[in-house]
Amino acid sequence: RMPVTLPQRVTKEMCDMLKKHHPLFINLQFNNPLEITEETKKACSMLADAGIPLGNQSVLLRGVNDDKFVMKRLNQGLLSCRVRPYYIFHAKGVVGTLHFRTSVDIGIEIMEHLRGYTSGLAIPTFIINAPKGKGKTPMLPEYVISHGRDTITIRTWEGTIIEYPNKDANVTYE
């Protein structure tokens, strides 16, 4: 969170030192588009100019970013700063932070909105970090409804149900 909360700590000297340790990848934690300021843009630019690929790992937080329009603005804003939205984590049930927790359904709704209304580059993966060390599990909207011999039935991001060819090459469709 340092480039977000204390961006002036990102200096030329720091970037020169980090350059010596390639490959180096840095994931940041922006949670709301209001955190994208002139100072954080400058810090991200300095890190990216040093050849460091930047990603972002947001935490889905009630009242902070649990709105599809807020999350879209955040992810599009990050791309403009050369930061690739990487993960949105569902908040864990940690004592003292439970009031920030949302339902998983809200996260899936946000992901469906992002899928339909922004660039694929601005779509992170929604993740539940499973309890007891069971690992990161992606939470994906269900788009495949059924599999047939020659077609699959799918739901588009708009909710339209269509049949799609499920054959080898040389199949045309409208």
Pin down the residues of each PLM region:
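Catalytic cores of alpha/beta
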Residues: N65-L78
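Short, solvent-exposed loop/turn segments at secondary-structure boundaries
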Residues: R9, D66-K68, L98-R101
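Mobile, glycine- and charge-enriched loop segments
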Residues: T40-D67, W157-E174
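Core AdoMet radical
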Residues: R1-V10, L18-E39, A43, P53-R62
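Auxiliary Fe-S-binding modules of radical SAM enzymes
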Residues: L79-E174
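Short, well-ordered coil/turn segments that N-cap beta-strands
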Residues: H22-L24, A50-P53, R82-R84, A122
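Alpha-helical scaffold elements within enzyme catalytic domains, especially in hydrolases
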Residues: M17, M46, G77-S80, H113
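Aromatic/hydrophobic pocket-lining residues that form the small-molecule binding cavity
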Residues: T11, T40, M71, G107
